[in-house]
Amino acid sequence: MPIQILPPQLANQIAAGEVVERPASVVKELVENSLDAGATRIDIDIERGGAKLIRIRDNGGGIGKAELALALARHATSKISTLDDLEAIVSLGFRGEALASISSVSRLTMTSRPEGQAEAWQAYAEGREMAVMVKPSAHPVGTTVEVLDLFYNTPARRKFLRTEKTEFAHIDEVVRRIALARFDITLTLQHNGKTVRQYRAVKEGDARERRLGAICGPVFVQHALALTWRHDELAIHGWVAAPQAIRQIGELQYCYVNGRMMRDRLITHAIRQAYQDRLSDEMPPAYVLYLEIDPRQVDVNVHPAKHEVRFHQARLVHDFIYQAVVEVLQQAQVASAHDDPTPAISGAARDEEPRGVENRASAGENRFNRPASSPVASAPRPAHVAAPRMPAGDIFRRREGELYQRLLAANPAPAAETDSAFVAAPGAPVTVAGPPAVAVSTAAENGAPGDSFGRVLTLCADGVALTECRSGVALVSLFHARRCLLRAQLQPPDEGLKAQPLLVPLRLTLEAAERQALKTQQPLLQQMGLRLQPERQHALLHAVPLPLRQQNLPRLIPQMLRYLATASVCDAASLADWLAAHWHSADEAPWTVAQAVQLLADLERLCPQLVQSPPRALLQPLDLQPGVDRLRQEEQLNE
């Protein structure tokens, strides 16, 4: 058979094999076109599971008569025109294949009218050459696409369609995914003349939670942990389900990259890895997450149906998502470990009896939570949490057990000053409060703040917080506090620190002394959660403990090995102290009061001994009495 150019209809039918898998694929492509056209309302009519009719009507910008014929041509699009556009795609569609492919395997008509056009026009393609015919029609501003008798001319494809119920279930799932991607769009889905779904456009707040509950179910909303995380040009927000509620929620996984619904292995792996210590292998995590990334850093031109993407910095994206999910799960775990086991209540189902929430000491008193008329101070009532209790890990159980042993041995603190933990409801970032503070009778005498580091008043210099405690006011070094916290986090338990695998092993070039230290100190490195494999002049780094995930590992690990090669004492405590001292923040932005409150809360939880006897490098009490005396002297002189 000689080489020849395929007829347009046959070429489009071949392309349709990649783009049009089933009726749900048609719905996805057409609705994405409506979204790209700026529609705020989209009506979807389905008959017989999409095999008989798929009709998409929108109120978008519409298509002019001059361009209507081109809209059904292959490789015709208004969304990109240059290679630069292809490398920074911001629209959902860009290939210019969908309409041509769909029209080649169905009877497709498109009716459209833009704002500045007096009448509407209708286009349809027919014949072997797919010639486009245009005729006048009646239609409001917007576009309607009708797809009749899908796969009527490809019997083999039509034979592989499932039952009407199954095909409509796939369409319903596509509509759910789009409704989650765009809360500002009204979507209506009808099947055989009956309205099945109607998602009204909502703004921020409780209405957003109600729509989330309508799509994902009330159980997910009740156990959802709000997530917001940002690093440079990467940002992620959304909700992840508390691990103990996964069995009730079932399989629910929605992920979006720059507003595009996605099923990406890298993203799935990062989220699964974040849950690995909290879920069994057969239980998938539940989440609704939105990843925002510079369009130039992601290639969406990978799969014809645009289900997959390729990240230019895959490891960075993987670790970013992993860190964000791990952080929110750990914060919720710590918070719920100190709260009562009352089930969570979301914005969609509020508690019938509202309760105030007590702030931790460093955040200041919640003045609106005082009893209306009670002369005797009583202990604050525990607040409901947005995430149910999660079983703490071994390291948390042991350290919290030690803390409560100190509580039993110490004099009880006044009930009115007991702290309670609190986790924000879905839609707000998860925050963590500290545990009940340890009462120490001699703390105030020694200049320590008593049962906590006190309330953060302000930041008087970068890295220095001014706090108010029982004994007065004090300056707290946030840099030293962070070092103390990291040292505590890097102290390995009996079974060693948990090693967090890297997505891609890191190849490090080592000097002779560093290679020798790696060989002799392998047991210590294993205990610290560092998985280093010697390889001639190099070493492969496979895993690191969680506090080191965001570090510059190619620089830090060789420095650590040089330290081990020359150190006189090599044990876990000294190595943890060295790592804490050489830890560098990737974000050099100035400290905020919220960060100071969070840091001191974590330090009080993990290092209660520092609250009792703070080192001078951490806390410096301020003596305000000389200043007060001088003011009084000035007042007397002015009288």
Curated annotation (Swiss-Prot):
The keyword DNA repair applies. One of its GO terms (biological process) is mismatch repair. Residues 370-392 have a biased composition (Low complexity). Residues 336-392 are annotated as: Disordered. CDD domains: HATPase_MutL-MLH-PMS-like (cd16926), MutL_Trans_MutL (cd03482). Keywords: DNA damage, DNA repair. It holds the Pfam family HATPase_c_3. GO terms for molecular function: ATP binding; ATP hydrolysis activity; ATP-dependent DNA damage sensor activity; mismatched DNA binding. Residues 349-358 have a biased composition (Basic and acidic residues). It comes from the Bacteria. The keyword DNA repair applies. One of its GO terms (cellular component) is mismatch repair complex. This protein is involved in the repair of mismatches in DNA. It is required for dam-dependent methyl-directed DNA mismatch repair. May act as a 'molecular matchmaker', a protein that promotes the formation of a stable complex between two or more DNA-binding proteins in an ATP-dependent manner without itself being part of a final effector complex. NCBIfam families: mutl, PRK00095.1-1. Belongs to the DNA mismatch repair MutL/HexB family. This is DNA mismatch repair protein MutL. It comes from Edwardsiella ictaluri (strain 93-146).
